[in-house]
Amino acid sequence: AVVAKPKTVRRAKPVFRPGGFIYELNVRGFTMRHPDVPEKLRGTVAALAHPAIIEHLQRLGVSEVELMPVTAWIDERHLPPLGLANGWGYNPVTFMALDPRLAPGGLADLRHAVAALHGAGIGVILDLVFNHTGESDALGTSLSLRGLDSRAYYRHAADGQLINDTGTGNTV
């Protein structure tokens, strides 16, 4: 293992404004077709730092953006056979790693976007999913927590079946 001291990053303190306007957005959906955002940035976290996106949010009077999940997720297993995909991010396979489809540049992309938004006076709220995973029910794929130790991470009934309080097949 290689251990490296992370770079010190100066972070702007968020400014709380009572009565603000929180705009919830799906990163991919919000930035994918904006004509002023360079094509290579569209659909990514990095696009949120583009002046056209920031100007649009400012024109709307947005005080904070709430980013729908940006951590790695998987499609529900019934979607691919139908030619469909999940773009919402609510089926996480990990809790803290960014989805490479949204942040191909990794954490640097998110840091840059947050710094640009903060610099424009716009706060950032991350929507995180901690109550279930995309591993689904007993028939789902073992990708992370289930493969490590299903009983330690997921709630199980006395008979060993996964408890499904979330409607997704499992409850953490």
What are the residue ranges of the model-derived segments?
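The feature marks proteins involved in alpha-glucan
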Residues: 1-26, 31-43
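Substrate-binding/active-site clefts of carbohydrate-active enzymes
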Residues: 28-172
